[in-house]
């Protein structure tokens, strides 16, 4: 009897796998870490092969810790970071690093898109990063048969089937109600060739993609009877997990960044610095409106990496204890959390972080 399901979270710092029963109780879980590389200020990259390895290791350990047999797993779905962009062949092969969601190298492309379309996209978004690749790495772009996101790449390697997520594609000009991408948007950019490299069809969260391939089943320690269903952006799927899935609800997601997302019948914000996605970005009939910051928890990790190497794995717990003795106002120390630019309210990828008020 296949009574259990697996949820995978492909996050910034690693892959986490959870085994759930039919009531939603967690029976087992595991985390496998991978590295982020920062080759230049404002850049952030990861190796796609590291994702596959981490997902395999975390799933195997989660199933083991749950004490269930692989033959009892019915389905698997994954949520990942976005927009984390990569190029690959039709067979999912790539030697190039993925451009991580927090990467701000496409600032100029974001401004160009704004000038030509009247919108003001974040440099985090897929079209901006894809346009950067075409302009700065034309051979890579020309050779690529697929330009996709982490979500799409992972699902392909699990099932052997290309598709994209409605949840991510709505950030690229996909209209769920029409079932098509906005070709006019890409024509304004003279970038319609990208449409031929986007993996289709677009599937909504929960829709079946297909069973695990034999190779994927072996890597994960499962069997080919496991169905893979479409997931979405980690923050969006987290919102569903919190039960914030009706018009008029909102949720705050925290991690390497933070994001406050609200579901409304109509766009909530009118400021060009704000961001609305939809319609039907996550929940049919709803727009999704966002606010948040690119660098939050990632700054804590930066501080740990640069200044707390001798404290070991529990460095953050030790910092928590030290912080309890710091008075309100932090003795005048102020931190602007712009390590990777500002997401809201300025939507400025070029600004950088600041620690102000240092003294002897």
What kind of region is each of these model predictions?
Residues 77-80, 148-151, 232, 243, ...:
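Short beta-strand segments
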